[in-house]
Swiss-Prot record:
<feature type="active site" description="Charge relay system">
    <location>
        <position position="739"/>
    </location>
</feature>
<feature type="active site" description="Charge relay system">
    <location>
        <position position="816"/>
    </location>
</feature>
<dbReference type="GO" id="GO:0000329">
    <property type="term" value="C:fungal-type vacuole membrane"/>
</dbReference>
<dbReference type="Pfam" id="PF00326">
    <property type="entry name" value="Peptidase_S9"/>
</dbReference>
<dbReference type="Pfam" id="PF00930">
    <property type="entry name" value="DPPIV_N"/>
</dbReference>
<keyword id="KW-0812">Transmembrane</keyword>
<feature type="glycosylation site" description="N-linked (GlcNAc...) asparagine">
    <location>
        <position position="793"/>
    </location>
</feature>
<feature type="transmembrane region" description="Helical; Signal-anchor for type II membrane protein">
    <location>
        <begin position="77"/>
        <end position="97"/>
    </location>
</feature>
<keyword id="KW-0720">Serine protease</keyword>
<comment type="function">
    <text>Type IV dipeptidyl-peptidase which removes N-terminal dipeptides sequentially from polypeptides having unsubstituted N-termini provided that the penultimate residue is proline.</text>
</comment>
<feature type="topological domain" description="Vacuolar">
    <location>
        <begin position="98"/>
        <end position="901"/>
    </location>
</feature>
<keyword id="KW-0926">Vacuole</keyword>
<dbReference type="GO" id="GO:0005886">
    <property type="term" value="C:plasma membrane"/>
</dbReference>
<keyword id="KW-0378">Hydrolase</keyword>
<feature type="topological domain" description="Cytoplasmic">
    <location>
        <begin position="1"/>
        <end position="76"/>
    </location>
</feature>
<dbReference type="InterPro" id="IPR050278">
    <property type="entry name" value="Serine_Prot_S9B/DPPIV"/>
</dbReference>
<feature type="compositionally biased region" description="Low complexity">
    <location>
        <begin position="1"/>
        <end position="22"/>
    </location>
</feature>
Amino acid sequence: MSSPRPSTSSTSSDSGLSVDTTAYPEESKYTSTAPGAGGLSDENRYRDVEEGEAGADEPFLPSAKKQAASGSRTSRLIWGLVILCVAGWLWGLVLFVTQNRSAQQSVSEALQSHESGAISGSSSSGKPVTLEQVLTGQWLPRSHAVSWIAGPNGEDGLLVEQGEDQGKGYLRVDDIRSRKGDATSQESRVLMEKAIVQVDGRTIFPVSTWPSPNLNKVLLLSEREKNWRHSFTGKYWIFDVATQTAQPLDPSNPDGRVQLAIWSPTSDMVAFVRDNNLYLRKLSSKEVVPITKDGGADLFYGIPDWVYEEEVFSGNSVTWWSGDGKYVAFLRTNETAVPEFPVQYYLSRPSGKRPPPGLEDYPEVREIKYPKAGAPNPVVSLQFYDVEKQEVFSIEAPDNFEDDDRIIIEIVWGTEGKILVRATNRESDVLKVFLFDTKARTSKLVRVENVADIDGGWVEPTQYTWFIPADPSNGRPHDGYLDTVIHEGYEHLGYFTPLDNSEPILLTQGEWEVVDAPTAVDLRKGIVYFISTKESPTERHLYQVNLDGSNLKPLTDTSKPGYYDVSFSHGTGYALLSYRGPSIPWQAIVNTETDELKYEETIEDNAGLARMVDSYALPTEIYQNVTIDGFTLQVVERRPPHFNPAKKYPVLFYLYNGPRSQTVDRKFNIDFQSYVASSLGYIVVTVDGRGTGFSGRKTRCIVRGNLGYYEAYDQITTAKLWGEKPYVDETRMSIWGWSYGGFMTLKTLEQDAGQTFQYGMAVAPVTDWRHYDSIYTERYMHTPAHNPNGYDNTSITDMTALQQTVRFLVIHGASDDNVHIQNTLVLVDKLDLAGVQNYDLHFYPDSDHSINFHNAHRMVYERLSSWLVNAFNDEWHRIADPVPDDSMWEKVKRSLPMLVK
């Protein structure tokens, strides 16, 4: 498949950046050589050459009968031949060893060929980044999480700290002002003296802690076991601060494994889920009250099923307390009609159960309720529990979606029993906002957005809607809420007040977007804090704006590139401001009481990271943009240290490119791509093509219904632009990605058909979107019934095109519960039917989507690295069409290992 020419193609550079790195102050105790160096000798290059038959390399000797009949002349002739053969063998051995050393040397030189003689780029004479350092996290910046907590009487600036600290106790609440000797600060309060707790003679080792809102109790979790990406089970305990003692969450069943536990806002109750049923424990009693009773394999209460956990809430909870503690809202999920998909485990037993005797050699099979595109979805409904009446009830919503066409994406409690519910249709392109009144048990539809009609796009299932209570004395006569709205092609903040008003007050507007907004709201001042891309799609800065849309201004330094995130205290008077790049990351506590941020304390400066950066030869990052068909796309090029523009460099393209994702940003990051540039000496390019986020909805939504086409086109077009650069070897270009990036790698190779990219490496790829989960897929592709041609077009089907590449690699975890191994197996079958052989395949047993079972994660990256080196060393060219070689030289080489033994 040939790609059409772009209407316009241009590049422009907006800045250059050297270095980006991380981690621990101490120098690494690990060392690593480039994978394959010293191990890619000639005899290992041709893996398709079969070994000769036994005895084939032995010198010819006459039979014993002929020997007896011969004279001394014949005997001398024979001995002469033997001597000649031995001499020839010795000479061959010398040549072989010499050539072998030369081959190893040439590989080593190939890996280092771009490390010296540069006239631009990094001039550091330091060591290259090693793969060992990347895999063991030695380049990760140090960072701290601050757990802000509201005081029992609404005090601001309090935070929870955990860990032994000079006899101050294991778990404590500190006032941030006390660090500077502020006389108005609250006294530090110790919640837990020790990290280990005794309960009825048992020793408990908590792995997580949650203080109650009044700080009198602490909920403890022990013996945690992972379920899916976000969910887990464990044993829960209630710890009393005053007595420093603990009791089981459910005294009648202390060993029961709990899936979720949440404090009530009033600190006197805990709602929890066990065996998919919801329970209530009042601290005034040791009895546990069941809220639901019919939960089981197909019915979930208060926790999401697999697809809602993965694709909607990105968490393990769908339980929400009302602010006054009088009601609990929760989702009821019915999976009865959802088909099951079997995931096999060959070495491990995720269930924790031993197989029956005699069945130890059979794999454990976990049947997952997994709705693929077009299959029945779980039926999800909202229910409520009245704590005082001990009653479960539901409220009918007018003009609601049908059961099989409804996805509930957010629940937001207000005051006086009011609750906002955001839901979409199955294809996620119509949003409805409902207002429920739990006291009156009524509801109404207050807002509808048909996004399909607005721009042909979709609604992302985010949870950032913010309730704004009425405060007439402060200029807010009615309740309201903040939500993200589409305005002139970009996502901005809108303030809806009263709650049933469908037209917002626009707080932001322009050709930029807010990101996961709002971050915080100061109700006293009427100020909204948010992160946005106002300066550049690759940057994140902190801003504030008044609730009436006035006085929008940045709070971080926008005079230079920056990437920030922030965590505010309960009353918004303080915040943890985290600078993520492009320079060395740092974190500081700031005071927001004044018009400008006041820096109170730097809690991390990554000084050790700065020293580490000085010791290593890091890639230079060049941020640019390309314009393709009128769309401006962000690009970063990582150049090897000592970059020499007079040389010709191989180029690796790295991508993810999923809808609304972003890979090109200004965060400080040393990763596998950095290793490839620093140690292997290759250029690495990443372009966020159409479909990615934060450049406006026009750029994003064009891919809907035809995933892969425009994205691949943008990768190919950008690669062609790079191929024209004088320092790029256009005959050595590869592309790689994981998950959606794996799909995009194969789609790009398919669309390119060997014209631009010679190689590709795809990890855990989707190969047919009919095999992926319904909620994610249909959001971007519609249903298969609605868009059959789109599903056909976006699948990897053109094996002839893939055959035009030199070679490609596919890797998959055999127990991937997310992107099922079915995707790769179906692709392999298509390759077999087409007679395509120019690929390598590697499966990792018992590994999920992250591929980390046993030593798999390390092996993935070592395989990627060595495979790429072989590709750019032209090894895959040499094995493309193997033929038998019966020359004496090949026989000698094959016989050497046996002779050495």
